[in-house]
Every structure is written in structure tokens, then in C-alpha cells.
Amino acid sequence: VDAWKPLNDGFERLCEKYPRFKNTNNINHLGTLGTGNHFIELCLDENNDVWVMLHSGSRGVGNRIGSHFIELAKKDMERWFINLPDKDMAYIPEGSDYFNDYVQAVGWAQDFAMANRVLMMNNTLQAIQDVLKIPFQANVEAVNCHHNYISHEHHYGKDVWVTRKGAVSAKKGEMGIIPGSMGAKSFIVRGLGNEESFCSCSHGAGRIMSRSEAKRRVSLDEHIKATQGVECRKDESVIDETPSAYKPIEAVICLLYTSDAA
């Protein structure tokens, strides 16, 4: 409840205009991981230091916000007779009816996502301390990355809106996280400020198989073998997240490095 208090006023303002955002388990979801490829992971780096890494976002309420404005954008494309190569490329132009509301809603969802991750990180550290039964403290910089969001930035001499979908900000010196699959290593990186990528880099390895294809093509035995040496779930319900469903993370990192992104 305490974590929700700073979010409440903004949420109430959103719901005054968009009642659909209510009843989205917004309070109950705060401090929860979610499904899909969301995870909490304990990692050892090359110095045998422990990193606690988690991947989660704005949960059900963020999904409702995104879905609602996507519907509005598609309707506006039809209303303005704008023909797109794909209907999923619908957009909300700056200065249009819903633009300011969209920016406000996405900004609030980013705040929710940040609060969600902070709450889970604190709970995870407390759980580790409870198990180890010895005091410890985290003495390194915490790294936080939004990876599905919009940001008002200055590029090529202009103020622009940057949409990062499955991408993180990689300004010069900025720290970022690029997770691998559940059977691969993850990387903590520093951005190089590449303007050609609008100071962005990959958020992860990226899929080479859809969830349904992975479930169809990968056996449980193959999944168990691929995650050998990793303490994680090894049952049929997580085969859609099996390592072979993703690109090799080393290849992704190599490409980012050679392209001066991170």
C-alpha cells in the first residue's frame, strides 16, 4: 500500500478520462513479476560478485493502457484515411486529440514499472538475507532500464519523440542491462552514445521462435539439457522460454560492440 501512494493521484486522473483503466489489479500487481519472459535471477560476474537481476514492467494496468491507445490510434488512421503497410504501425501524432493523454499515461506506467521493480528488488534482497541469516548490503550502482517506452529527446538538432520497443537507452557512459535467455549469460553494459541508433541498444537476445513454435519443436528433454547447470524451472509450461527460442546472446553483444552502440 505504501508503494502505491505516490502513484494514486496520477492513476485517479487517468481514470477520470479513461474508466477502462480501473479494475486492472493495479494495486495487487505492484510488487509482482508477471508471466512470459519476466524473471528474477541471481548471477555471478567474472569477479565472482553477485548480481540480482529482474525483468518486469507495468503489469496488467500497463497492458490495458497500451492496448487502449493502440485501439484509438488505429481508429484515427481509418478516420484520417491514412493507409499503412501494416495496421499495427498506427500512431498518435503530436497535437492530435489523444497525444497528451497518451504521453501522460505512458509516463505514469513507467513510474509504476519503476516502483514495481524497486519493491521486488527490496523483497528479493530481504529474502536472500533471511535465507543466509547473515547481514549483507549491496554496495554497487543499481541499474534500471525501461525497454518499452517513449522519451522526449534531442537528436540531429531537433527535439523528437523516441519510441523504444524492446530497446534501452544507451547514451554515452549510461549503464544498461542486456539479458540472455534462461540458459545463457546476461550482460551489464555502458552506452557509447551512437547517434545513428538514437543512443539506443538491444534489450535482449530477441526471439528466433515464437512461443507456439517453441512448444511444438522443443522437447522437455531438450529444454532440460539446454538449461543444465542453471537452477531454474524445467517443466513443460516454460518450454516457450527455452534457450533455443532466442538468438545467441554473444552474437547480439558482438554486433552491438562492433556497431559502437554499447
What are these regions (language model features)?
Residues 257-261:
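Conserved small/polar residues in nucleotide/adenosyl-binding loops
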Residues 1, 88-104, 227-253:
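A structural-propensity feature for long, helix-poor, extended segments
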Residues 50-65, 197-211:
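Conserved phosphate/anionic-ligand binding catalytic regions in large, soluble enzymes, centered on
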Residues 5-46, 98-191:
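Accessory "access/gating" subregions that flank catalytic or transport cores
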